Amino acid sequence: MTLSPDRVLPSHVLVEACENYQKQSYRNRCYILAGDGPQMLQVPVVHGPSMAMADVRIDYSTPWVVRTQRALDTAYETAAYYEYYRDDLFALLDAQPEKLWELNLSTIRFLLDKTGIACELEPTKDFVLPDTEADDYRYIIHPKRPDDVLTGLGLERPYYQVFRDRMGGFTPRLSALDLLFNEGPDSIGWLFSV
């Protein structure tokens, strides 16, 4: 990772494309805040043992795209900025990319663009062993690991959420989409403040 001239934002990030696909990870799922609490959105995949992440295909035999779009509409239709981002996000899903890697990369680019973060993403050409690079964040956030890192980085600092009153306050550990739909262009300010 290379930092931008302001020494805060990365200007160049390597994105792992050569690792083996890991089940039960955030590679094909995320959480949004629905009216009854966190809801998992999952992209069904077709994969084999020891399959590289870049080779994992998306399974379109079920109507998961429509279900995902309906879940997003239901959860965020009253969010302040959802209507401004909805069509662009849905276009990514409607494009039905063949590979999970393609969908993930286009979603990351969408989030970078909408938050105003200028960053070059470069897919890796070979697998790099963990902890051999100084700024290796590949395995920090995982559903099966403690969230100490998120707390330490300040990523559980509250921002406005549509269902905060119903949930009894802020709900952490959600997709960056939750931040974007609720904070819109101010998302970058929230990210800078953590």
How should these model regions be labeled?
Residues M1-V194:
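Residues lining hydrophobic/aromatic ligand-binding pockets adjacent to catalytic sites
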